């Protein structure tokens, strides 16, 4: 739709509404959170819903960092009510001087209130919840919240409703003076979380397991009390019905984390023991665990004060730059790199790396309340110096391990050089052609990339139908045929020589890997359109693996979609309807008794008009947008599904069968 610009010829329209001080709103208390919750928890969808739990758990973890807590219990109660209990000191209940309110009331009703602002004089030397908004934001986003505090031999309780106190703090009894801690129970507000208020056990488990790895020796228990389940015992018999529970405690800390990540992917390691580096200054502490494997991919997870930093920051920058320097300096000094050899690149030395970085700082500087990126400049120097000295020392003491890792990096460098030559060859060849576009591409007429879309179609037959049925003004078609390359088992140099993937690279126009530039993307929407069967699903997975490994911003910025062709055509007389799954088919069978039913075995069975109407027409089509909520989880899935190992792939499919679309 063209942009509509409205102008007014009525002078009174522009002056009737006077803009003055009465137009300025001052939001009091927690009104700002309830009015713009996304600013504080990221979204009001599933991600933001789970973020509420993380905020409360982070407060308990801060008690663990301070040395006062070693057990955190998280329960999902019936009705998707959350309860988090820790055995820390308990939130203070005495009167806070500035407000005249009990400290616990202040913490849950006033933004930027907490015990983490005083540096050396605060209740916490290191904390992830540095903004002092976590508890109050959860309160504001809850239909109701109750906090119980045990300290000084007494138990206190206060309840809030949508952020406001539902009565004063009360002492409800006495307890053993040695029993201390805080329990927070809350129900997310359905008025705010309109999409869902249902918690996903696996999502919570993953985050809490991370917390357990990052805090060696701290036990975290997660229990789902929404319904009982019957476990299957080792002998194959059914056990007694119980609540699903995961108990997580790792004495090995982030070393155990790296081992866990590798074992989940069933990767072949280059050295049996995880390399562990640790350094400290008066400004903070850093610890790094790393291990190399035979894969071609890198997995780096970073944390600051136990908060995951998916967008990286200064701690990652310090690690990456120093790691590359260590390899090149060690290689030169030990004759592994000759004078004529180029230096290894960062990508070379990180191929096959699994690494966890954890830093602890007194004054962590995050970008935004969701804390996706660390900004402390001093931590870059700490990490860089520590990695250089400690890793160089490790290599000197373990020359066999150093040599194995170095050989891996030099192989990556040779592949990178081969990829560069292949890339230049492709460019020279393209420059000689009248058009850089692949021959089978049927491009669209529109040149504005924000208005266009491309369908990558399985098979020449379906590609032909798509070309005839499309809206040629805005829709481009690129047919694919033959066996696709599995990039999980190949380096970049093979992509440039691949006649299935290079047409995709050329058509999209934005390059791959280190040269990827999303500003050059030629289409706003990139559709994968394959048959609705096992082969089609496999091709779709191969394409998604390629995009994830070499064009990840395409997915991260929401450009990749999977088209959903119908499975059935249902016709009764002149009435024709389509069913996209078995459930829709069952409903149509009841609605149209005696109808003729055709199951489509492939896209090629549909004529151009049907393909347009069911799968390509923006007004009618069913599509799935591909997103990455969790890069580490996505990495694990692609590694398992597209890797060499059969057994972990079988386990993964069995575990996730309820979420999969199977054709058997």
Where are these regions (language model features)?
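Conserved short strand/loop->alpha-helix "switch" segment adjacent to the catalytic nucleotide/phosphoryl-transfer site
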Residues: 35-54, 125
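A short glycine-centered beta->alpha linker in the GHKL/HATPase_c
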Residues: 90-95
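Short adenine-binding "F-helix/F-box" segment of the Bergerat
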Residues: 96-97, 104
């Amino acid at each position: 739709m063209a942009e509509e610009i409205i102008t007014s010829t009525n002078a009174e329209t522009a002056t009737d509404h006077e803009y003055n001080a009465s137009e300025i709103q001052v939001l009091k208390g927690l009104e700002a959170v309830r009015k713009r919750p996304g600013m504080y928890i990221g979204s009001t969808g599933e991600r933001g819903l789970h973020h509420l739990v993380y905020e409360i758990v982070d407060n308990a973890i801060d008690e663990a960092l301070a040395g006062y807590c070693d057990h955190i219990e998280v329960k999902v109660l019936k009705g998707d009510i959350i309860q988090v209990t820790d055995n820390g000191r308990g939130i203070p209940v005495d009167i806070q001087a500035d407000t005249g309110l009990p400290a616990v009331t202040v913490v849950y009703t006033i933004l930027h209130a907490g015990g983490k602002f005083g540096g050396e004089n605060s209740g916490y030397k290191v904390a992830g919840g540095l903004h002092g908004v976590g508890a109050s934001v959860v309160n504001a986003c809850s239909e109701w919240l109750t906090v119980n505090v045990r300290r000084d031999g007494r138990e206190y309780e206060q309840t809030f409703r949508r952020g406001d106190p539902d009565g004063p703090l009360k002492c409800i009894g006495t307890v053993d003076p040695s029993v201390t801690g805080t329990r927070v129970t809350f129900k997310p507000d359905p008025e705010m979380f309109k999409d869902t208020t249902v918690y996903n056990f696996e999502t919570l488990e993953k985050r809490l397991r991370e917390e357990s790895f990052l805090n060696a020796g701290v036990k975290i228990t997660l229990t789902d009390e929404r319904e009982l389940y019957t476990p299957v015992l080792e002998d194959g018999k059914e056990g007694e019905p119980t609540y699903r529970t995961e108990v997580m405690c790792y004495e090995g800390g982030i070393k155990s984390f790296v081992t866990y990540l590798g074992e989940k992917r069933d990767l072949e390691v280059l050295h049996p023991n995880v390399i562990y580096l640790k350094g400290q200054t008066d400004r903070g502490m850093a610890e790094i665990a790393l291990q190399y494997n035979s894969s071609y991919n890198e997995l780096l997870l970073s944390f600051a004060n136990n908060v995951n930093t998916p967008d990286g920051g200064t701690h990652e920058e310090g690690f990456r730059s120093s790691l590359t320097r260590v390899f090149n300096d060690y290689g030169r000094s030990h004759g592994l790199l000759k004078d004529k050899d180029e230096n290894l690149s960062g990508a070379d030395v990180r191929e096959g790396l699994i690494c966890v970085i954890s830093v602890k700082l007194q004054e962590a500087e995050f970008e935004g309340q969701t804390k996706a990126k660390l900004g402390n400049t001093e931590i870059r120097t700490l990490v860089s110096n520590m990695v250089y000295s400690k890793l160089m020392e490790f290599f000197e003491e373990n020359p066999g391990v150093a040599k194995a890792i170095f050989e891996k990096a030099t192989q990556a460098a040779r592949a990178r050089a081969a990829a560069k030559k292949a890339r230049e060859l492709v460019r020279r060849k393209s420059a000689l052609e009248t058009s850089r576009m692949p021959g089978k591409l049927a491009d669209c007429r529109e040149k504005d990339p924000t208005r266009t879309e491309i369908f990558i179609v399985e098979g020449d037959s379906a590609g032909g139908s798509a070309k005839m049925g499309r809206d040629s003004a805005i829709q481009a078609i690129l047919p694919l045929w033959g066996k696709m390359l599995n990039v999980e088992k190949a380096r970049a140099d093979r992509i440039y020589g691949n006649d299935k993937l290079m047409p995709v690279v050329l058509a999209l126009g934005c390059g791959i890997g280190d040269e990827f530039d999303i500003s050059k993307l030629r289409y706003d929407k990139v559709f994968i359109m394959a048959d609705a069967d096992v082969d089609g699903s496999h091709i779709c997975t191969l394409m998604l693996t390629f995009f994830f490994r070499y064009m990840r911003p395409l997915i991260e910025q929401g450009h990749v979609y999977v088209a959903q062709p119908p499975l059935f055509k249902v016709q009764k007389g002149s009435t024709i309807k389509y069913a996209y799954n078995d459930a829709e088919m069952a409903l149509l069978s009841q609605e149209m008794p005696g109808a003729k039913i055709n199951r489509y075995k492939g896209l090629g069975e549909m004529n151009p008009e049907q393909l347009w109407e069911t799968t390509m027409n923006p007004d009618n089509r069913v599509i799935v947008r591909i997103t990455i909520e969790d890069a580490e989880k996505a990495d694990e899935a692609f590694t398992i599904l597209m890797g060499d190992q059969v057994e972990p792939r079988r386990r993964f499919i069995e575990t996730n069968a309820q979420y999969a679309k199977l054709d058997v």
